[in-house]
Design a protein with these regions (language model features):
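A conserved active-site cap/scaffold subdomain adjacent to cofactor or substrate pockets
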Residues: 1-92, 100-103, 108, 112
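C-terminal non-catalytic interaction/assembly regions of soluble proteins
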Residues: 86-237
């Protein structure tokens, strides 16, 4: 999973993945296999990519038990579909534990509308301009505002249009989202998007809107001696 790229990195039977099974040997090797007659791909390339996933410094990967060092790892394909990993090392743990604290952080209001046919991108951009100026007229100020043309610039921003000029699209979807402290302020964006049916460019449809509370996360380090784990066993009936 999260590896396939058709024609570049093909994965057979992605709908029937066989997840890896790890065996740890006494001589500090790891042997990986997957169940026979399952899809997916287990080889040097997939194992290496997974090892490096979301690791900033392979020589210093912090865990509660050890600082892992993957910088000298070797990954080798063996016979019968096995993959061998060896060379991992460890350093003394930091003495701290990571704690992720969730807290309420306002609301996100979102509205979407589609435009299709000839000149649809220009009409979607005009609709975005209408929304922006309507918010000014209503004296609405938000801590964050985001406008996307899904299929044109939603992933890489407006700068991508300079590098990859937009093709002649037959459809595009406008998404406008805001962050607000109050729920009622976040709800405004949905009403304004819906008003584009009659007060916006021609041919809009498929309006959807939502308001969600935001749960943000702050990650902090605390001394490990402040945490006292306990284990409770319960017998089921």
């Amino acid at each position: 999973g999260y590896f396939a790229d058709p024609g570049v990195k093909d994965v057979p039977e992605l709908w029937n993945l066989g997840f890896p099974i790890l065996t740890f040997t006494e001589d500090e090797r790891i042997l990986l296999e997957k169940l026979p007659q399952t899809g997916g791909r287990l080889d040097r390339q997939t194992v290496t990519e997974q090892l490096l996933y979301e690791i900033q410094d392979p020589a210093n990967y912090f865990t509660p038990d050890v600082i892992a060092d993957f910088s000298q790892l070797s990954v080798e394909e063996l016979s019968d579909g096995w993959v061998e990993v060896k060379g991992a090392a460890g350093k003394k743990r930091t003495g701290t534990l990571k704690v992720s604290v969730g807290y309420q952080d306002g609301y996100i209001g979102e509205g979407q509308i589609s435009y299709g046919g000839r000149n649809c991108v220009a009409r979607a951009k005009l609709a975005a301009e209408v929304i922006q100026k309507r918010l000014v007229l209503l004296n609405k100020h938000y801590s964050e505002t985001r406008t996307d043309l899904i299929g044109v610039n939603s992933l890489y921003g407006a700068e991508q249009e300079k590098v990859f000029p937009a093709p002649q699209l037959s459809e595009v979807r406008l998404r406008v989202a805001v962050r607000a402290e109050k729920k009622e302020d976040a709800e405004v964006i949905g009403r304004e998007i819906e008003a584009l049916y009659v007060n916006g460019p021609a041919g809009g449809g498929g309006v959807r809107s939502s308001v969600e509370s935001v749960l943000s996360i702050a990650s902090v380090l605390i001394p490990e001696e402040d945490v006292h784990p306990t284990v409770c066993w319960e017998r089921g009936e």
